[in-house]
Swiss-Prot record:
A GO CC annotation given for this chain: mitochondrial matrix
Function: Citrate synthase-like protein; part of the gene cluster that mediates the biosynthesis of squalestatin S1 (SQS1, also known as zaragozic acid A), a heavily oxidized fungal polyketide that offers potent cholesterol lowering activity by targeting squalene synthase (SS). SQS1 is composed of a 2,8-dioxobicyclic[3.2.1]octane-3,4,5-tricarboxyclic acid core that is connected to two lipophilic polyketide arms.
InterPro entries: Citrate_synth-like_lrg_a-sub, Citrate_synth-like_sm_a-sub, Citrate_synthase, Citrate_synthase_AS, Citrate_synthase_bac-typ, Citrate_synthase_sf
Protein name: Citrate synthase-like protein
Keywords: Transferase
Lineage: Eukaryota, Fungi, Dikarya, Ascomycota, Pezizomycotina
Length: 465
């Protein structure tokens, strides 16, 4: 099969695409045409595809660099070993590296330029000029809130911010040395069980959330508070400290810090977590967001989807990378061991967490903002003995041809742990805080899905003997 790019222009013959002696007047189906058929673009771009199996030419519309899978599936050829049965063309794309499964108006990324925007607003502008609650509002409802809208938004989160007794009782029965994410998921599962609307939605034919934005918006507010309150409850249980009641008039992050009893008189801690959270609020269809939406396509409740997303994010190749990156620095032990470690990475014996990203071909814009935050906490971060190891890895990887030629640059995970630890946040609680960070993007994608036609996500596979 040969593919030739079609450009907008004059009507053209494409008989020179193939050896005319091979055509033999064969007709193709659907979008197909003969080699001697002129193609009028009429302002539309096409791929002109010659199928050597059938000697047919197909004209596949191209829109903004994408072709639709349904258009490709109009290309068919006899199935080998069958008596004339036709097999539609499909795409094999392990890891979804070249496949878009949805259209979205939420987040834009240009990996070649290192550009990230939420609803058209540059990540740098949000980081410097707005807080996390405003960013949540922007992501979910498509605009930065007015002062009145922000007050109302924060009040609504406060009204559902106290965890029910059932949640507290379940969490307090868990061993304090249990894996933090396991405790977090247990608490959230219990919280979900206390929400009658969500549990009822799984057992009725009438769709609770789809095309019902008021119900969807109310559920989004509850989800924000459920996650924050559960994380605070788990933290207080592990640390053996009192869980404080939420306080009206505080932001989501400020209330979380208040509930765990962390003193923040000058709001330096909350403002830092706010900006770290803005940095991680959404990233198109990350692994966890895709997992969330995969489950959401069955029209279950948002907390069920969220449990799936948190589980996906806990893996070392995704949200767990921040913690694993820090553990890697501990294993290296000293600056003197960095050259040997870099050599082992190049020999593919180890993975260098915190470097490289599937999307970005230059430095992740979030990494630059993380470095900026580090300067505000320089004294506490400099006291961390692992920092010099990280700096030396960064220096060597940034100049080594192996990394440069492969366009492997610093990403948002590499230095993130240093800031959380400098703030006094326990390392095992960082994945939970990252969940709060990602809530805006997850809820925005869910709301977008609930407002659009639904098809259950059911990828194909290629059977292999």
């Amino acid at each position: 099969m040969a593919i030739v790019n079609g450009a907008v222009g004059k009507p053209q013959h494409i008989s020179d695409m193939v050896d005319s002696t091979k055509m033999n007047g064969n007709q193709s189906q659907d979008t197909a045409g003969r080699a001697d058929t002129p193609v009028s673009n009429g302002g539309q771009d096409y791929l002109h595809v010659f199928d050597s199996r059938t000697c047919n030419i197909h004209h596949i519309p191209v829109s903004d660099g994408f072709v639709r899978g349904s258009d490709l599936s109009t290309i068919a050829a006899p199935l080998k070993g069958s008596s004339g049965r036709m097999q539609k063309l499909a795409v094999l794309d392990p890891g979804f590296q070249h496949t878009a499964c949805k259209e979205s108006s939420i987040t834009f990324i240009d990996g070649e330029k290192g550009e990230l925007r939420y609803r058209g607003v540059r990540i740098e502008d949000l980081f410097h000029d707005h807080d996390f609650d405003s960013t949540l509002h922007l992501l979910v409802w498509g605009r930065l809130p007015t002062k009145e809208e922000k007050i109302k938004f924060e009040r609504r989160m406060f009204e559902v911010a106290s965890p029910p007794q059932e949640v507290c009782d379940v969490i307090r029965k868990l061993p304090k040395n249990m894996d933090f994410i396991s405790m977090f998921l247990t608490g959230l599962s219990t919280y979900m069980g206390t929400d009658e609307e969500m549990t009822r939605s799984r057992h009725q034919a009438v769709m609770t959330y789809h095309k019902n934005l008021q119900t969807t918006d109310d559920a989004i507010i509850r989800c924000f508070s459920y996650v924050s309150a559960t994380l605070a409850t788990v933290y207080c249980h592990v640390k053996g400290v009192e869980l404080h009641h939420p306080q009206e008039g505080l932001t989501l992050v400020e209330n979380f810090l208040h509930m765990i009893g962390m003193e923040d008189p000058d709001k330096k801690i909350s403002r830092t977590i706010d900006r770290l959270s803005i940095n991680m609020a959404d990233h198109e269809l990350s692994c966890s967001t895709a997992a969330f939406l995969h489950v959401a396509s069955s029209l279950t409740d948002p907390m069920t989807c969220l449990l799936t997303a948190i589980s996906a994010a806990s893996g070392p190749l995704h949200g767990g990378a921040l913690e694993v990156c820090y553990q890697g620095l501990e294993l290296i032990g000293s600056v003197d061991n960095v050259p040997a470690y870099i050599a082992a990475v190049k020999a593919k014996k180890f993975r260098l967490f915190g470097y490289g990203h599937r999307v970005y071909k230059i430095q992740d814009p979030r990494a630059a903002l993380t470095k900026e935050l580090m300067e505000e906490h320089r004294e506490a971060i400099d006291a961390n003995p692992l920092l010099q190891i990280a700096v030396e890895i960064d220096r060597q990887a940034n100049t080594d041809p192996y990394f440069v030629e492969r366009k492997l640059k610093l990403n948002a995970d590499f230095y993130g742990c240093f800031i959380y630890i400098a703030l006094g946040i326990p390392r095992d609680m960082i994945p939970g805080l990252l969940t709060i960070s990602r809530m805006g993007g997850l809820m925005a994608h869910w709301r977008e899905a609930m407002n659009n036609p639904i098809k259950i996500w059911r990828p194909m596979q290629k059977f292999k003997l």
